[in-house]
Each structure stands twice: as structure tokens, then as C-alpha cells.
Amino acid sequence: MNEVAIVKEGWLHKRGEYIKTWRPRYFLLKSDGTFIGYKERPQDVDQLETPLNNFSVAKCQLMKTERPKPNTFIIRCLQWTTVIERTFHVDSPEEREEWIQVIQHVADNLKKQEEEMMEVRSGDSPSDNSGAEEMEVSHSKPKHKVTMNEFEYLKLLGKGTFGKVILVKEKATGRYYAMKILKKEVIVAKDEVAHTLTENRVLQNSRHPFLTALKYSFQTHDRLCFVMEYANGGELFFHLSRERIFSEDRARFYGAEIVSALDYLHSEKNVVYRDLKLENLMLDKDGHIKITDFGLCKEGIKDGATMKTFCGTPEYLAPEVLEDNDYGRAVDWWGLGVVMYEMMCGRLPFYNQDHEKLFELILMEEIRFPRTLLPEAKSLLSGLLKKDPKQRLGGGPDDAKEIMQHKFFAGIVWQDVYEKKLVPPFKPQVTSETDTRYFDEEFTAQMITITPPDQDDNFEFVDNERRPHFPQFSYSASGNA
């Protein structure tokens, strides 16, 4: 294995993802794609401290812009099915060009290495990376090409800069799915292939009872489509709004299933979910948790006259995200703390309509609890809502195991959680997977065609020449969803 070396280092101005100020950071780019940033220039590169910013340039796309500042460049990549961006600026066009060339060079090398490894691994199977990838994830090739015409389009569930999410009904089965549609032009630069779709593989390979499964993925001439499970037991948000508060036992049940899913993502997939909030938690027909990936919020943050335009709910943002420091796996445990606080206390731990004041509360305010909360629950929530991710419960090297061993979860057999042996505390009153009683009547009563599929959108009418950037993108889960 090649030794990891520092390829380039130097000062960059990084723009905050949420509080959109520019902060100077000293960045090191390594040959393995690691791109890490520090407040001060590190004294000893052989004994680096924990960085403030830590991400990878593998499979990234690079863009140049002169807004909001001259000599700006953006690193864009697909995380799961969500497009994330990091924005930097430097002092001169030459300096920007230098960074872009080096980052692109590292990304290209990594892609080449991955392709070589896939060739070795695939043996007799097709030698191109994407073909081998499909061989790995799909036990049987789709019997027919999936197209947009096979669904009824019922309701817009979410909309963002890069696409939209629609509640759809598969005509053949009557089953409901969430279809996430991303515009190709934002993932593929003008003449440049984006090294994306790793997350397509993450989704295809993800097999966990409490995570939303990917049923199909396919493409049209201008879009990538992910068709994902849509659990019909209703949003947890809906049930909590109706009951105002859950018992500690009920919160423990949901919390355990969420921990099990996040543990799987962190340890098996090396994915930080980043977006845990009540609206992203649904119940299946039996009352088990399904964590969704329908969000377009991180994509919907606009640049505008005000530097603080948000999509979605900033109430869930962890302190390290607001401060634009490194957010590793511990960011998910903060999210768990917020949703479990809501379940047991009936309100958000920090809230103010004014975003500036809200950010101040998240960063500075001590957490308060209702008197009725038992000590074990207080201890768990205090641990999960620690401001410093290193001090946070789950913030150590043992990650989820720290939370699993907390006294609040004493008595929980974690293998039983995974195997769905625990009886859900609430069973949605649905009779089948096509029962829509927990769906908003506004969209179950009538069919709305969001985007009438035309012939151009039909997968079968699009030949490979017109979609060279995304070979072998189509996928169909074998067996039932």
C-alpha cells in the first residue's frame, strides 16, 4: 500500500456552512484524499492534532466562481443521496488554479486505484468499475428497465436547489415510495464527469431494518432518480404532536432502534448521517423506526442578500456544525439527543425564532430538564447534548457502544433490537403497505402529476451515448422491499 503523503498545504479561507462567514484555515491535502483544516499551522506534521475540518476529496467535483468573493472554488460531492458543498477562496487566480489542479490530481489517482481494485476483485465479472459494482449489489439484473411511467406522482414531499422528493405509487403493486430526483447538470459539470455515485453504492449495499431501503435507481436524459421505501406508519413527528410527550419506555424503544441504525452506518459504512431530526423518522406498519433519506435541506441553503438563509430546521444543528469545526460521528449523537429530548420533554432543548439567538443558545446555554424526568434519562440526554463533541456520549472511539452501555439502556439486548424481537410500544392502525390513513388527506384524495413524464424522460428511449457520465446506474432490489 502506498504511504500517505502530504501533497499540498497552505492557508485557505473557508466559508461557514450555516453561519456564512469566512474563516482562515490552514489546510493539508493528503494523497489518500484527506483534506484537513486547522486554526493554526500545525507545528509537527508527523503528530497532527484533531483537525477542525476533515473531509475527503475522493469522487469530488470542482467548480470555480467569482461570487461571493473573487478566486472562490467549491468542492462538491454526493453524500448518500444528498449533494454537499464546501466553499473556499484564495488571494489570486494562480493560487486557486494550483489548489484545483492538485485536488483533481489526487481525486483522479484515487479513482484509478479504486478501478484497479474493482478489476482485481471482480475476477470474471465485467472489469469496469460500475459494472462490477452492479454485480456486487444486485443478485439479479432488473428484468426490465424501470421508467418514470411506472409511477403515479402524488405529492411533493420536499424541494431543494438540486432536486425534489415526490411521494409516488408504483402502478403495478400499489406500493408507496419516495422518489428523490436530482438534476444531472448540478452533479455533472459542463464538460466534466463528476466522480460521484459512491452513495448510490452505499444505499444499494445498506441492509438494515431501521434504514430506508433503496428499491430502484434509474436515470432519464437529465435526471437521476432514487426510489426509496416510504414507511406508511406515519412520521414520528405526527405521532408526537398528537400525544405531546412519549413515555420513557417508548422513547427508549425508538432511541434503541435509532442507535442500532447509526451504529451500522458508522461502523459498517463509514457514513455520518448528519441530518437526524424528528421529521426524518418514520414508523413502518408494525411500529418500528425507519430513518429516511428524503431530505433536500442541506441542498436548499441559498446564497442571497442575507447571509443567513436557511432551508429547514436549524434547531437540530450541533455546536461544532455551527462553529464550522470538524463534525465526525459525534454529530449524529447530538441529533439523537435532540430527538430523544423532544420525545421525553415534549419540546426542543433549544429554541428561539431569531436564528442568531438560537445559535447562541445551542453554543452557550446549559440544558434544562422537566422535574418529572428520571435520573437515567437526564444523564443520557446530558451526555448526548454535551457541547464539546470529544466530551459527548458516543464521542469517544467506542462510538455507539458508549451509548449502548449507558444505564438508560440497561436491560436492552441489542441483538434483539436488531432482530425486531422487541414489541413496539405503539402499532400504527394500518392494514397493509398500501393503507394511507397516516398520509395527509390533501394528497391521498387526488393524483397530482408533478412532472408529466414525456418520452424523453423514459429510460428506454435514452441510449448510452446520451448518458456517458452514469454508466450502469440502474438498480433494482431483488426480492421484496
UniProtKB/Swiss-Prot annotation:
Gene3D superfamilies hit by this protein: Phosphorylase Kinase, domain 1, Pleckstrin-homology domain (PH domain)/Phosphotyrosine-binding domain (PTB), Transferase(Phosphotransferase) domain 1
Top EC category: transferase
Phosphothreonine: residues bearing it: 309
Record InterPro entries: AGC-kinase_C, Akt1, Kinase-like_dom_sf, PH-like_dom_sf, PH_domain, PH_PKB, Pkinase_C, Prot_kinase_dom
UniProt-listed GO biological process terms: cellular response to epidermal growth factor stimulus; cellular response to growth factor stimulus; glucose metabolic process; glycogen biosynthetic process; insulin receptor signaling pathway; insulin-like growth factor receptor signaling pathway; negative regulation of apoptotic process; negative regulation of release of cytochrome c from mitochondria
GO MF, any single term: ATP binding
Tissue specificity of this protein: Expressed in the oocyte.
Modifications after synthesis and translation: Cleavage by caspase-3/CASP3. Cleaved at the caspase-3 consensus site Asp-463 during apoptosis, resulting in down-regulation of the AKT signaling pathway and decreased cell survival.
Catalytic activity reported: L-seryl-[protein] + ATP = O-phospho-L-seryl-[protein] + ADP + H(+); L-threonyl-[protein] + ATP = O-phospho-L-threonyl-[protein] + ADP + H(+)
Positions of the PH domain: 5-108
Site (Cleavage): residue numbering on this chain: 463
Cellular compartment(s): Cytoplasm; Nucleus
Top-level taxon of origin: Eukaryota
Ranges of residues in domain Protein kinase: 151-409
Glycosylated position list: 127, 130, 306, 313, 474
Region annotation (Disordered) ranges: 120-141
Residues annotated as binding ATP: 157-165, 180
Sites of Phosphotyrosine modification: 475
Entry comment, domain topic: Binding of the PH domain to phosphatidylinositol 3,4,5-trisphosphate (PI(3,4,5)P3) following phosphatidylinositol 3-kinase alpha (PIK3CA) activity results in its targeting to the plasma membrane.
Family indicated by similarity: Belongs to the protein kinase superfamily. AGC Ser/Thr protein kinase family. RAC subfamily.
Protein's UniProt name: RAC-alpha serine/threonine-protein kinase
Species: Xenopus laevis (African clawed frog)
